Amino acid sequence: VIRPLIVLVLLFTAVIEPARAATDAKALLISIRKRMESSGKYTAELRLKVDIPFMKAPEAKATLAFTPPNSTKITSKGFAMIPKQSTELSALSLLSGEFAAIDMGTENFKGLTLRKIKIIPADESGNIVVATLFVDESAMLTRKVTATAKSGGTVAAELVYDNVKAASYCLPSYMKISMEVPNFEIPRTITGDFNESSQPKKPVDPNGKTKASVEIWYEKYRFGY
């Protein structure tokens, strides 16, 4: 009698634990979303440095304006190459609608043990099909994000939080976006002209992809303006 009871307990545990992990993972992400939503209206000054083969782009400046619940506008008076991934990879953007969360365990990143959570947005009209958030549970901050777009391309972002006030709303002071894009078809929003790089051109990837990165510094946050 005891042995069958033990088997039933083990089976029940095997079923309930993954469900509990998924629930806890989603609850964690919802907590982060609520912190970001509590920021209210804000602006920030941006510095952008773009590294794309075959193109030489000067460091640019822009202004970011956020209006609840999830409207982000980036403008620049001069030259600006602003990848749309800079807003798509925001935790608030990824978590703004309904989503499924899958607990993928933990992963070490720059000396930190991060909770790895895969999310699948319920809204199929968005550009992001699936994303993985690497969460620092002790600080309740997303340190890294990887995402797959409808085009099949993979994008990754690393985030730093040096501004204490901004970090309290899970907003970064620095973000580095790395991606692969089709050769000669760099996705961008441009104001002004750009110059072809004077550096020797790198060999074209046989898979038809070009590696690119964008560094963004977020400065002079203004909340509740």
PLM features: what roles do these ranges have?
Residues 16-21:
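Sec/Tat signal peptide C-region and signal peptidase I cleavage site
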Residues 22-41, 45-51, 55-58, 65-141, ...:
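Flexible, processing/modification-adjacent segments and terminal tails
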Residues 113-225:
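Gly/Pro-enriched, hydrophobic low-complexity segments
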Residues 4-13:
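Sec-dependent N-terminal signal peptides
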